[in-house]
């Protein structure tokens, strides 16, 4: 609230139950009188137009009869009134009145009164335009730089700008991407129209661009605009303000500069005429109207802002200069010269309270209401407290809002995978080259403790693995029931899945006393499928393109003991070497060293190494656990194969780019196909037969192109899905090698998996490359940052498909480099602080320049040869196979 209230100079109440808005008030010398005094023009939604010329005998007097110069019923709602040079052949001011379906321009002339009734005004219609569309608002100005006259631009409710050159209609243009109309203003300095769209951004359109754009006599679709002649309407500049705008106004202080003022719902903006922000002021209250005006004496631009607290604030830039209290909420505010009094503030409320006031120091008569207090009765408070505590205890007992402990699970879920194949394979519609694809049965058992309704079981496995049934529904009408379902899993397509792990998820709702609909709960149980489901014994290979070596701290184990189900006829040869043949076609060889504690895995494809390597480590852990050995550990001392990993990333990214190009080309051909169809339809409907001019041939050719492109898009999507599966396999392998290389803990491995494997499914809108790049950049900025300077870098907030993969590959290389130099993966708040690390001798700094970064990308595989001396030799806790373990 303000200490002072606005000093009332003149006021009146307009009509009875009439409504007004910000466009209903205007101040101007509408009758072109010689003294230059402004008149108050007010229009209402009831269709009444009034013109006032206040002449109070003393300050604070109400309206007299002679103050009303004109009152006329126009019979149509008045949306906006403006005064300008709207009639050709003269530079006299005329009144423009905007109705919902009509624009009228009137000539207003004053008549001196010879009796006590005072002066009068007469209004004559000069011309009118009937509108084809429902109007919303209008603006005027010297469009195109014309001299001595004003043109009018009307914005319709469906987004069309209609320009009128005085008595004639010029043209109409639709705003692109229009949804809802916003405030409209004209800047004479830049010859542009400014509005605020429903996208919450300020948009500027050049008048010249509007004039030469494609005609909009009827709204055309985007595809027609592309194929038609003429230019498309292009926005000059935009600025996102993040909120809807109440009003927009342009003020020119001098000929060299102008400012665009925008009043938002919570902020007040001042922009340059090129869209750059001069300043912004956050408002602590809800504004209702505003008016920027030039202060010639101070050489600044001041702004009047009214709000819903009956206040009027005066700002000089962002500085509050004065605050005054009004008797009403203003919806429109103007400043003018009335009765030789300059700077009169005229405000209008939505219910017709019109007031002329000026600033002063009359004290506000507002008094705060007395606080109603009552004496406290402590006995009643004790009783109320006990009742509330009882309610809280009841809620805790009924588990209405609190999560239940693990001991009180409503449902137990267990999964058992059959050790043998199905006698009759359940595989159907397979695309694998082998004659017979095996299947294995999985049994899921559910046992309830309480009554549950509509428990839904969903089972998920990694593609190209397929389930015979993946959705089940149960009804547990009585406690302690046991339900068992069975389904089969098999390999559907001819490539290798990225994981052999499946997940069974049960969702249900448990009703309580306070929540009869039930509390939603989810229980999941993971299970592991056997390797032999996708793999057969194969012939070992002596040579291969890709090899990795796993070191252990125990003596080598016979491969026959680790993989008993993959032994062939010559068992003696398979003690130290064993071959595997995936159903998808890949061949992998595992060799156990006779003299050292090492195992080598080799294959022709890099991503095919993952499943066998992971299976080897898991079976080694199981073997030594059965032997009672607790200090078994695996490690990796070779170089991280980043170059092979980057090749898979590039191939996946190339398929994504190719998919975008194919979809864009398909969209263009579809537009062309529909355009030819319309031309043919017009020819067939024509009463006078005309030659088709090979339109039928063109239609047939375009149809074949659309079908071919659709097939190409479908084929590319299949290749992209397969490439993403291979990329996930390679990513799992790289994470495993980094974990063995740096002896990472289970929590640190989980952070790497969350960063490198954030998506279950890859799409064009949100792909693997941009998501992983954002996650790795966050790690480099926080827990792996070198200094506070790196922490201050702002990451891109939008996940867009990148131009190439160079930035992603550079970040992956830096991640490995910083891990090798003592970096610690952690998500705690203190991890973002710079850490002091004692570096061993011979360690170089991280390359930061462009040349160094290029060398890192080229020689990434040579950087990480052996960094075992950087970390202590502590055994890494490994996760046992997840065979039927519920969470």
From Swiss-Prot:
GO BP of this protein: cilium assembly; fat cell differentiation; protein localization to cilium; protein transport; visual perception
Protein name per UniProt: Protein PTHB1
Effect on the protein of changing residue 186 to A: Fails to restore protein stability
Protein function: The BBSome complex is thought to function as a coat complex required for sorting of specific membrane proteins to the primary cilia. The BBSome complex is required for ciliogenesis but is dispensable for centriolar satellite function. This ciliogenic function is mediated in part by the Rab8 GDP/GTP exchange factor, which localizes to the basal body and contacts the BBSome. Rab8(GTP) enters the primary cilium and promotes extension of the ciliary membrane.
Organism classification: Eukaryota, Metazoa, Chordata, Craniata, Vertebrata
Site feature Critical for protein stability, where: 141
GO cellular component terms, semicolon-separated: BBSome; centriolar satellite; ciliary basal body; ciliary membrane; ciliary transition zone; cilium; cytosol; membrane
Induction of synthesis: Down-regulated by parathyroid hormone.
């Amino acid at each position: 609230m303000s200490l002072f209230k606005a000093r009332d100079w003149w006021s009146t109440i307009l009509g009875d139950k009439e409504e007004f808005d910000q466009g209903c008030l205007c101040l101007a010398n509408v009758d072109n009188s010689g003294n230059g005094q402004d008149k108050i023009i007010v229009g209402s939604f009831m269709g009444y137009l009034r013109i006032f010329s206040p002449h109070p005998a003393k300050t604070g007097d109400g309206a007299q009869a002679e103050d009303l110069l004109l009152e006329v019923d126009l019979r149509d709602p008045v949306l906006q009134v403006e005064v300008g040079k709207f009639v050709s052949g003269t530079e006299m001011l005329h009144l423009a009145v905007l109705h919902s379906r009509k624009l009228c321009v009137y000539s207003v002339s004053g008549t001196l009164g010879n009796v006590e009734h005072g002066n009068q005004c007469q209004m004559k219609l000069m011309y009118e335009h009937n509108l084809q569309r429902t109007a919303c608002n209008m603006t005027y100005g010297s469009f195109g730089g014309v001299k001595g006259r004003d043109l009018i631009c009307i914005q319709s409710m469906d987004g069309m700008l209609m320009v009128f050159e005085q008595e004639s209609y010029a043209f109409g243009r639709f705003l692109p991407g229009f949804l809802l109309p916003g405030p409209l203003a004209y800047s004479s300095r830049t010859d542009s129209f400014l509005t605020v769209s429903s996208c919450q951004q300020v948009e500027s359109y050049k008048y010249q661009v509007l004039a030469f754009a494609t005609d909009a006599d009827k709204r055309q679709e985007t595809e027609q605009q592309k194929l038609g002649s003429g230019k498309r309407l292009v926005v000059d500049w935009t600025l996102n303000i993040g909120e809807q705008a109440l009003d927009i106004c342009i003020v020119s202080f001098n000929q060299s500069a102008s400012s665009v003022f925008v009043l938002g719902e919570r902020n007040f903006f001042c922009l340059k005429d090129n869209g750059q922000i001069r300043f912004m002021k956050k408002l602590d209250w809800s504004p209702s109207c505003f008016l920027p005006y030039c202060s010639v004496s101070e050489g600044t631009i001041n702004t009047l802002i009214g709000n819903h607290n009956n206040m009027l604030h005066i700002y000089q830039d962002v500085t509050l200069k004065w605050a005054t209290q009004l008797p009403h909420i203003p919806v429109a505010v103007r400043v003018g010269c009335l009765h030789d009094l300059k700077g009169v503030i005229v405000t209008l409320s939505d219910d017709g309270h019109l007031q002329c006031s000026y600033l002063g120091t009359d004290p506000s008569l507002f008094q705060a209401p007395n606080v109603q207090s009552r004496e406290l009765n402590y006995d009643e408070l004790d009783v109320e407290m006990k009742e509330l505590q009882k309610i809280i205890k009841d809620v805790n007992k009924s588990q209405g809002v609190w999560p239940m402990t693990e001991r009180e699970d409503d449902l137990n879920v267990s999964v058992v995978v059959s050790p043998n194949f199905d006698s009759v394979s359940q595989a159907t519609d397979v695309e694998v080259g082998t004659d017979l694809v095996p299947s294995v049965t999985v049994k899921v058992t559910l046992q309830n403790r309480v009554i549950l309704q509509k428990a839904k079981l969903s089972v998920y496995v990694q593609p190209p693995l397929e389930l015979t049934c993946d959705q089940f529904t149960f009804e547990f009408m009585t406690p302690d029931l046991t339900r068992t379902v069975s389904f089969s899993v098999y390999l559907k397509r001819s490539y290798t899945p990225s994981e052999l792990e499946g997940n069974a998820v049960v969702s249900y709702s448990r009703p309580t006393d306070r929540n009869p609909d039930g509390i939603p709960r989810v229980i999941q149980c993971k299970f592991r499928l056997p390797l032999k489901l996708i793999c057969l014994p194969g012939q070992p290979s002596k040579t291969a393109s890709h090899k990795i070596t796993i070191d252990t701290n125990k003596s080598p184990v016979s491969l026959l003991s680790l993989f008993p189900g993959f032994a062939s006829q010559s068992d003696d040869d398979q003690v130290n070497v064993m071959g595997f043949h995936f159903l998808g076609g890949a061949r992998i060889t595992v060799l156990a060293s006779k003299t050292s504690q090492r195992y080598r895995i080799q294959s022709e494809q890099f991503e095919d190494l993952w499943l066998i390597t992971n299976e080897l480590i898991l079976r080694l852990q199981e073997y030594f656990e059965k032997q009672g050995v607790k200090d078994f550990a695996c490690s990796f001392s070779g170089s991280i194969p980043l170059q092979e990993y980057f090749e898979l990333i590039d191939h996946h990214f190339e398929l994504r780019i190719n998919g975008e190009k194919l979809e864009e080309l398909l969209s263009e051909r579809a537009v062309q196909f529909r355009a030819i169809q319309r031309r043919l339809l017009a020819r067939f409907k024509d009463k006078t037969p005309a030659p088709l001019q090979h339109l039928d041939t063109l239609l047939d050719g375009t149809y074949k192109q659309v079908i071919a492109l659709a097939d190409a898009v479908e084929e590319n999507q299949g290749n992209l899905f397969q490439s993403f599966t291979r990329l996930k396999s390679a990513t799992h392998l790289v994470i495993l090698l980094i974990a063995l290389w740096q002896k990472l803990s289970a929590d640190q491995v989980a952070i790497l998996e969350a960063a490198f494997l954030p998506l279950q499914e890859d799409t064009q809108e949100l792909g693997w490359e941009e998501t992983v790049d954002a996650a790795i950049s966050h790690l480099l900025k926080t827990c792996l940052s070198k200094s506070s300077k790196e922490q201050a870098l702002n990451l891109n907030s939008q996940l867009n498909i990148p131009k190439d993969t160079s930035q992603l590959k550079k970040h992956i290389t830096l991640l490995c480099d910083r891990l090798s130099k003592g970096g610690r993966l952690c998500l705690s708040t203190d991890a973002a602080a710079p850490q002091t690390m004692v570096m061993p001798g011979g360690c170089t700094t991280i390359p930061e320049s462009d040349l160094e970064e290029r060398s890192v990308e080229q020689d990434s595989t040579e950087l990480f040869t052996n960094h075992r001396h950087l970390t202590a030799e502590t055994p890494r806790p490994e996760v046992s196979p997840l065979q039927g373990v519920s969470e």
